[in-house]
């Protein structure tokens, strides 16, 4: 099977399907979980553990294209986050989530299915903002479909000069109602409110009584997402991070959702973004020939 110039043999549990906006995608039907990976953005848009329910939220209005990132799933923010450390870069959250990634390999390890994708400077060359992509930056994303969803991003500097980048796994987690969700494991960490610019320490669990858009620096491991604040309190997701020291927590609430064309007005209670990141002061610099591995595991805790 040829996909974006790569000859890849697919196991029986993986097949090519039509993805968002009719673009190529892979459907994984593994022993422990199933899901979908879009080549646009190298983006996981579905993960369902065996006998469980969907982990990820995907907007029913999601679109994909050279100027459009898919709303939902796990967008890969690279090589900058937001407008970048200096606030002047565009498009928001970098070019990786708008690029056509190439399939490198699919393999089975025990009861896990692992999909590997790559993105190169050539893949972004025709995109708006391509001049801001470091010429030596190459990245591989390894997606593991097991009992948990594993993502491992390896960034390499194949150029002749040092390069600096930010990265985030902008995961949209599906929830019953964000207004009854708590995010645990952040207490005591430094927090930047991106809306107000105020810095503070996290006191207690994060809850959602309006728009939340915060960057939490170096929270403890793990982070747990809990549905229900008092009676019926149920831990639903556990998040472990590798070389991603920061956490970004976001929900637009009703007012901000009105300005998001690809999010239905009534959809905001159904997701919360808990992102594993290395951004702002934690941006990574690679010398020529150097690489680094960044990762996160999202484990479902309840059916």
Language model regions located:
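Beta-strand-rich N-terminal accessory domains
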Residues: 1-71, 222, 226-243, 288-303
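Beta-strand/loop-rich accessory regions of lumenal/periplasmic or secreted enzymes
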Residues: 68-94, 184-193
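Asparagine-centered strand-capping/turn motif at beta-strand->loop junctions
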Residues: 37, 153-159, 300
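Short coil/turn motifs at secondary-structure junctions
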Residues: 122-124, 158-160, 176, 301-303
């Amino acid at each position: 099977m040829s996909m974006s110039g790569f000859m890849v043999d697919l196991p029986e549990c993986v097949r090519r399907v039509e993805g968002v906006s009719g673009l190529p995608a892979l459907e994984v039907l593994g022993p422990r979980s199933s899901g979908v990976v879009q080549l646009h953005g190298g983006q996981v848009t579905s993960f369902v553990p065996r006998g469980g329910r969907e982990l990820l939220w995907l907007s029913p209005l999601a679109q994909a294209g050279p100027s459009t990132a898919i709303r939902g799933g796990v967008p890969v923010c690279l090589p900058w986050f937001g407008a970048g450390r200096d606030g002047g870069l565009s498009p928001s959250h970098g070019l990786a989530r708008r690029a056509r990634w190439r399939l490198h390999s699919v393999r089975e390890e025990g009861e896990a299915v692992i999909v590997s994708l790559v993105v190169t400077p050539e893949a972004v060359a025709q995109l708006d903002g391509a001049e801001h992509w470091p010429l030596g930056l190459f990245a591989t994303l390894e997606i593991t479909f097991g009992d948990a969803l594993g993502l491992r991003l390896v960034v390499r500097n194949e150029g002749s000069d040092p390069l600096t980048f930010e990265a985030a796994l902008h995961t949209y987690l599906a929830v019953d109602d964000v207004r009854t969700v708590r995010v645990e494991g952040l207490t005591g960490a430094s927090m930047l409110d991106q809306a107000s610019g105020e810095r503070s320490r996290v006191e207690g669990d994060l809850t959602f009584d309006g728009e939340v858009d915060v960057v939490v620096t170096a929270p403890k491991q793990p982070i747990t997402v809990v549905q229900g604040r008092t009676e019926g309190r149920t831990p639903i997701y556990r998040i472990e991070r590798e070389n991603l020291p920061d956490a970004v927590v976001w929900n637009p609430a009703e007012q901000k959702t009105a300005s998001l064309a690809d999010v239905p007005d009534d959809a905001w209670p159904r997701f919360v973004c808990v992102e594993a990141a290395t951004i702002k002061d934690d941006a990574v610099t690679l010398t020529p020939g150097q690489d680094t591995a960044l990762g996160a595991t999202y484990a479902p805790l309840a059916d």
